């Protein structure tokens, strides 16, 4: 049984010039995840459920657990003295860590994706993305360090809190998964070099918004629902409402996750920096694809911290089909 710490150190030996800082950074995220896991498991017993009464910069109601998870991860990252600053879905602006001006890395995160599911005991997750800063070490980080295309990510991953808690991450050399053993307090290697199955037969989308979808997405959904034995259609519809949980299932079983633009959200709803980029990095490393309907997600150059994007991610042939339908049936 190999632990996450042992696995990271083992991989570090493959790179003679590695300093161990990235290893320590991922260890900090691991610690934050263990704390969040502990408190999610007793969420119904303590007062951390429901809305906080505070709105974020996008005007969305923040849940108590969103803020709690944000503070725990922020504290874990700051304590290591490696991260120069963070950007979070729950923070209006970047957070600069004083006294860590020499830190090489910045972290972007969605501390608790799908937190509205907590009240009904459905899987939620943490998403993280790591970049090397581009401003000179020894100075405070700026927004420039965070507004990098996803192709510049050093590492990315997620933690899914479900029937078991699992940490899945990549540093650009495959996707690896570790399952948390609460009796030992360690994450143990459960899957190495994960890939999407060759073919996917599941689509994940909130079809309640169907009337607001672009014409190309509507046509693709009808394609998914048509009967065709040669392509094993109709496909199965599975939607949890937590990006991490939906992505994780499709990674294991094969499928596509779709969150298109709508009339009410013409730029899409998911955040490019905190959700789309890290999941796109993982998808490509697992042999899949991620797109905004026209462009590769990892090629997009962000302009603002909380920029949104349409998002299509999963098996490459399914994402390719979605792009084709969007090209063939453009909205007027």
UniProtKB/Swiss-Prot annotation:
SUPFAM superfamilies: Carbohydrate phosphatase. Keywords: Carbohydrate metabolism, Cytoplasm, Hydrolase, Magnesium, Metal-binding. Its cofactor is Mg(2+). GO terms for biological process: fructose 1,6-bisphosphate metabolic process; fructose 6-phosphate metabolic process; fructose metabolic process; gluconeogenesis; sucrose biosynthetic process. Mg(2+) 1 binds at residues 89, 110, 112. Binds 2 magnesium ions per subunit. The keyword Hydrolase applies. It catalyses: beta-D-fructose 1,6-bisphosphate + H2O = beta-D-fructose 6-phosphate + phosphate. Its EC number is 3.1.3.11. It is an enzyme of class 3 (hydrolase). It is found in: Cytoplasm. The keyword Hydrolase applies. It comes from the Bacteria. Pathway: Carbohydrate biosynthesis; gluconeogenesis. NCBIfam families: PRK09293.1-1. Belongs to the FBPase class 1 family. Homotetramer. This is Fructose-1,6-bisphosphatase class 1.
